[in-house]
Amino acid sequence: YWAARISDITREDTVLVIGAGPTGLCTLLCVMLKRPKRIVVCEKDENRIRFIHAHYPGVLTVSPEECADFVRANSDHGGADVVLEVAGAESTFRLAWECARPNAIVTVVALYNQAQSLPLPEMYGKNLTFKTGGVDGCDSQEILDLIAAGKLDTTPLITHTVPLRDIAAAYDLFEHRRDGVIKVAVDCSMA
C-alpha cells in the first residue's frame, strides 16, 4: 500500500508491476485502487499468470523476456509511467528501469540479497525518480478500513487455511511454495 501511495499513480498512467508473488499480488491490489489507465504485470510463473487472469481480467501480463517490448507497445509514452519492482532479483531491478519511460517513477518494493548498482551512463537522459516502498505501518488503519469496506479484497490470495496447531507445516508449505500456495490463513479457533 505504501509503495503504491508513494508512486504518485494517476488515472492516465501505465503501471508495470514486476513480480506476482504474494507481495507482488498485494502490490497489484493496491495499484488497482489508484485506477490507472493500464496495469501490466511481469511474471514468469504460469500458475501466477493464470491466477491474475482468473481474478483480475483487466490486468495485462507478460513474461520477463518480452516485457520491455510489450510495455513499449502497450503504453502511451514509450514505457511505463510507474514501475513497481517487487521480484527482488538483479535482472528484475535492471528490467524496472529499462521499462520505465523518461521521467518515470521506479519504486523498489523488493528486498535484495545483494546491493544493486545504478548504471548511470546507461540511464543518462531517462531522468528517473527512484523511491523505496518497503513496509510502513503508518497506513495500517486505512488498509483495514479499505478491507472492511470491501474496496480491498484480499480473500483470493488466501489459498490455504490451517489450524494453529499446524503452523509449522503451514510455514513449510509457504516457504517451499508447494500446492499453489499464495497466502496461508491461520485459524486460531481450530486449535
Show the residue positions of the predicted features:
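Structural detector of well-ordered beta-strand residues that form the stable sheet scaffold
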Residues: 16, 40, 105-107, 131, ...
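Glycine-rich cofactor phosphate-binding loops and adjacent beta1-alpha1 units
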Residues: 7-9, 49-50, 54-129
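C-terminal hydrophobic helical "lid"/dimerization subdomain
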Residues: 94, 98, 137-191
